[in-house]
Amino acid sequence: MKEFIKNTFQASNCRHLMLTGTRGAGKSTLLAGLFGENTPKITTWAVPEDGVYLRVNPLQRTWKVGLFDPDLPGPENRMVPLSFPVEAVHALANAPGEWAVVAEIGYLEFACPDYLQALWQLGKTKRLALAVRKEAADKIPMKDVFRVDLDDPAGNTGCVIMASGLGQRFGGNKLLAPFRGRPLVQQILDASAAFSHRVVVTRHQEIARLCRTQGIACVLHDLPHRSDTVRLGLEALNGVDRCMFCPADQPLLTGETLLALALLSQEGQHIWRPRCGAPGAPVVFPQWTFEALKSLPQGKGGGFVVESFPERVRYLDIHDPRQLQDADTPQLLRQLEE
């Protein structure tokens, strides 16, 4: 996960990094792995039935910033805020280097507006890496932040698996052809498992049955055009903020690539796609493209929208071209299996 976050953050070109998630999601541990011990850092920790303490490493000084209250209902959040030291933030500002780490922001910090205001000001002169409790994440006012929700990295990204092809070049329904002992389509079903908003669009009864046995939403249709598949997929995922259209015949496409595209597309302004030299699929479309996708010219796919807005396309560079390779013939499928 550490290398995945590092590489995806670098691809985003964002200034700041924010890891969020529920308690115990591993936010602070990941930040510690991403940034060495020498990076200027504010750390907080709780002592059971005592309080919460804050330490800033440039000063090697510790403050008590929270007090245990046994009368609170619990079992969590039984600390009440004391004063958070603005002096600790100033120490980060004066430390060398471009980065500063704040290893926890939650309900205690939000009870101390002067401390928070100092942090937001710090973001104007330092790049910040923040670990933020999920309930506080939407309150962060900073811009140009790459956000990773460790509980749900795909977030509100829809995933439409395009499984309607007739396999004419393959000589049959290639999505049911064996690949490493399982139907080819199973590869993309596994790779996209992290998407809570996901649907398979297919003309094939066998694929619909396979989806049903695994509890995966499926739209079975008999419409002839690629534009129909796009529209049906979007209509089935009403309410998503962006939507990935994923081919079902790229068996080496990884779940990490799908999640990286989902994370990068959170900024909501650009169309995102992978490339390894030449661009490929899948493609993530932001919400502002949805009406155009639903009204594509007959027979056209999402590429029609991509070509209409070339200045709005961004790329995730990957290093294995085989991830983007279609298994269009039995020979190609065997080569990808090797």
Residue ranges and their predicted role:
Residues 294-338:
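Conserved alpha/beta core of the MobA/IspD/sugar-nucleotide pyrophosphorylase nucleotidyltransferase superfamily
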Residues 29-77:
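N-terminal phosphate/diphosphate-binding loop that engages ATP/GTP or pyrophosphate donors
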Residues 186-244, 256:
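Conserved N-terminal catalytic core of the sugar/cofactor nucleotidyltransferase
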Residues 157-205:
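N-terminal glycine-rich phosphate-binding loop and ensuing alpha1 helix
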Residues 225-291:
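Conserved beta-loop-beta/alpha segment of the NTase-like Rossmann-fold superfamily
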Residues 26:
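Conserved glycine(s) of the Walker
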Residues 23:
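The conserved Walker
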